[in-house]
UniProtKB/Swiss-Prot annotation:
ATP binds at I20, G62, V63, G64, K65, T66, E67, D255, E321, R393. ATPase subunit of a proteasome-like degradation complex; this subunit has chaperone activity. The binding of ATP and its subsequent hydrolysis by HslU are essential for unfolding of protein substrates subsequently hydrolyzed by HslV. HslU recognizes the N-terminal part of its protein substrates and unfolds these before they are guided to HslV for hydrolysis. GO terms for molecular function: ATP binding; ATP hydrolysis activity; peptidase activity; proteasome-activating activity. It comes from the Bacteria. GO terms for biological process: protein unfolding; proteolysis involved in protein catabolic process. GO terms for cellular component: HslUV protease complex. This is ATP-dependent protease ATPase subunit HslU. Belongs to the ClpX chaperone family. HslU subfamily. PANTHER family: ATP-DEPENDENT CLP PROTEASE ATP-BINDING SUBUNIT CLPX-LIKE, MITOCHONDRIAL-RELATED, ATP-DEPENDENT PROTEASE ATPASE SUBUNIT HSLU. It comes from Helicobacter pylori (strain HPAG1). InterPro entries: AAA+_ATPase, ATP-dep_Clp_protease_ClpX, ATPase_AAA_core, Clp_ATPase_C, HslU, P-loop_NTPase.
Amino acid sequence: MSKLNMTPREIVAYLDEYIIGQKEAKKSIAIAFRNRYRRLQLEKSLQEEITPKNILMIGSTGVGKTEIARRIAKIMELPFVKVEASKYTEVGFVGRDVESMVRDLVNNSVLLVENEHKEKLKDKIEEAVVEKIAKKLLPPLPNGVSEEKKQEYANSLLKMQQRIVQGELDSREIEIEVRKKSIEIDSNVPPEILRVQENLIKVFHKEQDKVKKTLSVKEAKEALKAEISDTLLDSEAIKMEGLKRAESSGVIFIDEIDKIAVSSKEGSRQDPSKEGVQRDLLPIVEGSVVNTKYGSIKTEHILFIAAGAFHLSKPSDLIPELQGRFPLRVELENLTEEIMYMILTQTKTSIIKQYQALLQVEGVGIAFEDDAIKELAKLSYNANQKSEDIGARRLHTTIEKVLEDISFEAEDYLGQKVTITKELVQSKLEDLVADENLVKYIL
């Protein structure tokens, strides 16, 4: 069931579990996502008139721009795609054209809908798989047998199915027929070429062609699950629903938008295709029709969230028409030493919890003293100040450095609980951070 009806307060509360600070950014994005729900409650004629208010997020790398958008799209089960503006080229140049981001969104949307339909049919699919395997393991019943024999066979089949479900026969081998693996199609090529590719595949690689394979029961379960899913699912309905959902509630996150801004300071040294990419992007953000392999999609109701650091350029360096299409602007705060500490201690799946869980797999307990966590936050913050500011990502590199030896020699610590102290953190990191020339080694 979709969680599109979450209130802005609920959205912000959810984000607070994973992202520290950035209240204004969370608030703006929460309202934008809530408006998606509000629009869908209106009459059809009015829905068409209301377009989303696109957002421009301004902030350094690692402060939570992508994470905010990604987390909301995930919890609300919306079609979402993250792209980097710098990867696109102007029409006529070699590279990806901007329309491919819409095609990627539609692909993700169809996959999202397909997974939902599979979940609904999960029990039915598993029953069909188990029944098919059981009939392979049991010799077939000869014709003309008595009702008593038929009942005995039915009982044996039921017992066999129970054993398969419990995994008792996972290592047994059986021969089954499976479809030939389909050829992957590149979704980044224009729709016209996609159709040619699909037609060629139908000619040279018929879907109904099957091959016999000897697999273990465990492997056969997975192979048959995919095949039976395709049989039970209404692929046409899934495609149509995926297309509709991408059109009405899709979200495209465009990172590094500042990389295609033409700075007035740089002048003639700028890449001439940057402005071309902006002009190609403009009709998609304004609202146009893009052809995909699933059909045409209108883009005027897709929510676009652009983000960039804008260190070498300003938002005003974007072409005026594109600026006007991102009416909501949010500036994200740089991370302080205190926020670094809170990221390590207060987030639901903090980096510390992640490393503790990873090493627990090896039977090694890890405990961090509070002073050690504060020192990690302090040294990570100092490293950001002295070198390139990569925000919270710096914490990954510093913790990795501190735990490097323990991770490598995990078997030596089996059954032990290792305490990470302030002194240990300092011994691993302070020499590197103190020397500005060596700070690059912990990037």
